[in-house]
């Protein structure tokens, strides 16, 4: 008698990891509030646009340091303890903002926020990857992506309440600490400790040039948006409510981007998907250029701006995997793409801050125009991967290497 093997179920996996998902959703809310409110607070403090760019870029510098050091921490202390420690550090970093207004002090705290937040995400995504079978991993990660956009959107809605700085930090800390409760109260079996590994930086530019260029561009576009979009809206004469609406609409565009380009790229290839996304974002950028005084048009344009750019990293990763002859090299390529994205994310706020200081609100748009034109032209001269050699597209933010 043949015994049928039970097929893995995404619903069952999500249910098993429900405490993890609830916790990270609450942390996404806190992070959305902390990240998007920075530009507004620094503007109120009288900080120049250049220094706002420098301070906010420290968040992404912390993310780079997390990619280097957090994995070995998880290998030593396990998932549950690492999650608790990094969540506590995240909450402490948010709390300390109320104790001083020094630029250097804020830059240091932003660094700690970035390090702790990305370390939390590394714990969660590594856990999800370990517990999800290959057949259902993309669907479990898609659910996780929905939580990210939903949580970040709630944080942005809270920002619209126009609260004082103290209340914003208090609410964000509340959600961050609340996010630590499910993991510490529900009995959940954590995965075995990951093996320790040496840090290595592979050299694969000759193999996946479009993927590396795409991930670098994604880093600049996404970090510039999250760090400087609030400053941009203020420069155009908008209010805190306008900032909230602007970012919330952008998040909807980003979510729909993941859904659309997954199917499109599987049918027509990553190169044409990257070019289409860049073209849509470029058209939106030019419309923004000529309508800087009209916030309603800007809110429509930002939907298409993020629709075209928020999937660039996932498309770049899919492109890289399509180009590989030896699939065992995918880990090294993933590390290279993450490094490329991280460098872009560090440079994005710095460049955008300088451009806004020089050109005003137009500077925000010019950064997108220049970098997107470069990527579009570069992509046009790259080869197309045949359909039979393409892998499955997985919606993925460039938060961490998933091992």
Whereabouts are the PLM-identified features?
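Symmetry-related core transmembrane helices of the 12-TM Major Facilitator Superfamily/SLC fold
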Residues: 168-185, 365-380
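Helix-to-loop junctions at the C-terminal end of transmembrane segments
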Residues: 66-78, 163, 257-269, 356-357
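Cytoplasmic helix-loop-helix junction between adjacent transmembrane helices
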Residues: 111-146
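Paired small-residue
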Residues: 104-112, 296-304
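Helix-loop boundary and gating motifs at the non-cytosolic
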Residues: 10-60, 208-214, 222-239, 243, ...
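Intracellular juxtamembrane helix-capping segments at the cytosolic ends
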Residues: 119-132, 310-325
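A late C-terminal transmembrane helix in Major Facilitator Superfamily
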Residues: 327-357
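Structural signature of the two symmetry-related core transmembrane helices
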Residues: 81-95, 272-287, 369
């Amino acid at each position: 008698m043949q015994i049928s093997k039970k097929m893995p179920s995404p619903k069952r996996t999500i249910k098993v990891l429900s405490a993890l998902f609830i916790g990270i959703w609450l942390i996404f809310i806190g992070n959305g509030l902390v990240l998007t409110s920075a530009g507004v607070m620094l503007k109120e403090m009288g900080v120049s646009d250049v220094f706002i760019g420098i301070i906010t870029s420290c968040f992404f510098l912390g993310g780079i340091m997390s990619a280097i050091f957090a994995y070995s921490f998880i290998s030593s202390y396990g998932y549950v303890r690492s999650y608790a420690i990094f969540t506590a550090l995240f909450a402490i970093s948010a709390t300390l903002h109320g104790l001083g207004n020094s630029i250097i002090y804020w830059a240091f705290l932003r660094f700690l926020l970035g390090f702790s937040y990305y370390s939390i995400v590394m714990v969660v995504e590594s856990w999800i990857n370990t517990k999800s079978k290959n057949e259902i991993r993309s669907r479990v990660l898609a659910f996780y992506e929905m939580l990210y956009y939903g949580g970040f959107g709630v944080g942005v809605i809270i920002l619209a309440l126009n609260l004082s700085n103290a209340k914003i930090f208090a609410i964000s800390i509340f959600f961050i600490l609340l996010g630590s409760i499910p993991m510490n109260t529900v009995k959940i079996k954590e995965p075995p400790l990951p093996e320790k590994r040496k840090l290595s930086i592979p050299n694969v530019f000759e193999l996946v040039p479009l993927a590396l260029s795409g991930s670098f561009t994604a880093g600049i576009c996404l970090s510039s948006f999250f760090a400087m979009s609030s400053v941009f809206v203020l420069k155009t004469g908008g209010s805190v409510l306008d900032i909230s609406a602007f970012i919330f609409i952008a998040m909807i565009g980003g979510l729909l981007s993941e859904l659309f380009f997954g199917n499109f790229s599987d049918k027509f290839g990553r190169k044409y998907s990257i070019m289409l996304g860049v073209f849509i974002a470029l058209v939106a950028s030019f419309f923004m250029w000529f309508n800087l005084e009209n916030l309603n048009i800007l809110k429509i344009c930002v939907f298409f701006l993020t629709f075209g750019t928020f999937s660039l990293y996932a498309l770049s990763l899919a492109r890289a995997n399509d180009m590989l002859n030896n699939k065992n090299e995918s880990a090294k390529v993933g590390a290279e793409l993450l490094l490329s994205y991280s460098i872009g994310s560090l440079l994005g706020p710095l460049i955008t801050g300088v451009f806004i200081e020089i050109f005003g609100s137009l500077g925000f748009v010019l950064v997108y125009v220049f970098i997107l034109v470069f990527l579009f032209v570069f992509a046009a001269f790259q080869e197309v991967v045949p359909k039979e050699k393409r892998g499955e597209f997985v919606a993925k933010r460039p938060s961490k290497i998933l091992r």
